[in-house]
């Protein structure tokens, strides 16, 4: 089993930057804002054939109210999960009272702890680190995480007692069905994730946009593996002023591309707004399978529920293939019914059919409804084959098929959907016109032969006229 290493420290000491250096990614949002990382964030890492899991935590601050206190509780949870703790301090800021308080708590845990002094660049390291010996954790390991300096030496020290992997490929674990939960800020995404997981895993605070980063959470249900991706809420671009929110939008779009199925969460009480439609548009551009969850359905009047249903039917008419569920993430109503739709969408998105079967369906469709004519010549569709999955892509070859009008494309899409009962996924149809191998070639016959052909043609036409008389 992979060991778990937790990065612990007060806010803004550089834990997220160090996390990125260790995991070789930008998986944690990094900016010069105290308390930016608001939730535990897991990342797989490998160093010198040793695999481990890194947990990036929110800072343990001095505030005892609001979200800062809640984040402190999340950090304590990460400490309990960890096999090794990296206690990060700021060499530039020096030793603070909150560092000493954290050190006292860590010493009571009986776990292996490594003191790491970050931001040693630009300071006299030996002088700056003297005061940290007061913590009683030995000599601090020196790093400059923003530049990657000292990180390798730190990992060698931290991982010295961890055995090498017998086979690194065994650690490329199957993440199962990857499920991205997306939506505007404060529509209940994190509450839905917590309900699906059955634990208070993601910070769900009554503040818009409490989850700024995308969080990957592996779990199992009824013997099936999943990875839940809880994304930051996407705001309208006009309101995205802070660098943090810009990072979050990018992370949400990346999470969509990484997911197999996207669950779009909509607030029933606020109704469907343009940003909900834009978000669905992003998912369609990514070609992702989709399930719609209309959340906060509880405590609505019968009239409001009726109006909401009418609004859903009207505004979502461009995705008739998407399953729509009315749920209450807070109370769990309807949440369990999401899974069958998720599974059906996943299976539809990963359709695999032989070229022979697809071509037969194509022939039946064109026999029932002939393709239109283009410039006096009818479009001829010869054969079809799969071009990919998620979304299912069907490639059709023939003559002038690239001229196929939109309404006939929709007809073919509906035929394939009906035959294979495709639900919850867009279907992409591509057309490839067969090239004429002789196009552009000049005639190789000499003038004498060409003249003889012309005489034969003239004689044939005269004979044809006499026959008609």
From Swiss-Prot:
CDD domains cross-referenced by the UniProt entry: EngA1, EngA2
Keywords for this protein: GTP-binding, Nucleotide-binding, Repeat, Ribosome biogenesis
Lineage: Bacteria, Pseudomonadati, Pseudomonadota, Gammaproteobacteria, Moraxellales
Organism: Acinetobacter baumannii (strain AB0057)
Chain sites annotated for binding GTP 1: 9-16, 56-60, 118-121
PROSITE patterns: G_ENGA (PS51712)
Record's protein name: GTPase Der
Subunit structure and binding partners: Associates with the 50S ribosomal subunit.
NCBIfam families recorded: GTPase_EngA, small_GTP
Function text: GTPase that plays an essential role in the late steps of ribosome biogenesis.
Residues annotated as domain KH-like: 351-435
Highest rank taxon of the organism: Bacteria
Family to which this protein belongs: Belongs to the TRAFAC class TrmE-Era-EngA-EngB-Septin-like GTPase superfamily. EngA (Der) GTPase family.
Gene3D superfamilies associated with the record: 3.30.300.20, P-loop containing nucleotide triphosphate hydrolases (3.40.50.300)
């Amino acid at each position: 089993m992979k060991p778990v290493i937790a990065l612990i420290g007060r806010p803004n000491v550089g834990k997220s930057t160090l996390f990125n250096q260790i995991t070789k990614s930008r998986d944690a949002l990094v900016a010069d804002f105290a308390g930016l990382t608001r939730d535990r964030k897991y990342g797989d890492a490998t160093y010198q054939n040793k695999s481990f899991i890194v947990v990036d935590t929110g800072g343990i601050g001095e505030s005892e109210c609001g979200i800062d206190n809640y984040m402190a509780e999340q950090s304590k949870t990460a400490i309990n999960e960890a096999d090794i703790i990296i206690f990060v301090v700021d060499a530039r800021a020096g030793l603070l009272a909150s560092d000493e308080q954290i050190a006292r708590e860590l010493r009571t845990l009986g776990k292996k702890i490594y003191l790491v002094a970050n931001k040693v660049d630009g300071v006299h390291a030996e002088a700056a680190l003297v005061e940290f010996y007061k913590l009683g954790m030995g000599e601090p390991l020196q790093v400059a995480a923003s530049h990657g300096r000292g990180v390798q030496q730190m990992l060698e020290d931290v991982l010295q007692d961890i055995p090498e992997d017998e086979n690194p490929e065994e650690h490329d674990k199957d993440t199962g069905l990857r499920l991205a939960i997306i939506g505007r800020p404060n529509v209940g995404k994190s509450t839905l994730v917590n309900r699906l997981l059955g634990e208070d895993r993601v910070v769900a605070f009554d503040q818009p946009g409490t989850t700024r980063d995308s969080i990957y959470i592996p779990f199992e249900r009824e013997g099936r593996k999943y990875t839940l991706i809880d994304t930051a809420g996407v705001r309208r671009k006009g309101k995205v002023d802070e660098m943090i929110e810009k990072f979050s939008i990018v992370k949400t779009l990346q999470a969509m591309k990484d997911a197999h199925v996207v669950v779009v969460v909509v607030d029933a009480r606020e109704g469907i707004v343009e940003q909900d439609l834009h978000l669905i548009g992003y998912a369609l551009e990514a070609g992702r399978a989709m399930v719609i969850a209309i959340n906060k359905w509880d405590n609505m009047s019968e009239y409001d529920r009726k109006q909401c249903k009418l609004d859903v039917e009207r505004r979502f008419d461009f995705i008739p293939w998407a399953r729509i569920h009315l749920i209450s993430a807070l109370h769990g109503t309807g949440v369990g019914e999401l899974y069958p739709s998720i599974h059906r969408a996943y299976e539809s998105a990963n359709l695999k059919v032989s070229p022979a079967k697809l071509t037969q369906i194509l022939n039946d469709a064109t026999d029932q409804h002939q393709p239109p004519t283009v410039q006096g010549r009818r479009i001829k569709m010869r054969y079809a084959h799969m071009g990919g999955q998620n979304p299912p892509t069907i490639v059709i070859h023939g003559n002038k098929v690239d001229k196929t009008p939109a309404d006939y494309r929709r007809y073919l899409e509906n035929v394939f959907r009906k035959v294979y009962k495709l639900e919850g996924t867009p279907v992409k149809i591509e057309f490839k016109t067969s090239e004429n191998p002789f196009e552009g070639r000049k005639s190789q016959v000499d003038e004498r032969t060409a003249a003889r052909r012309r005489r034969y043609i003239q004689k044939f036409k005269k004979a044809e006229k006499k026959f008609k008389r």
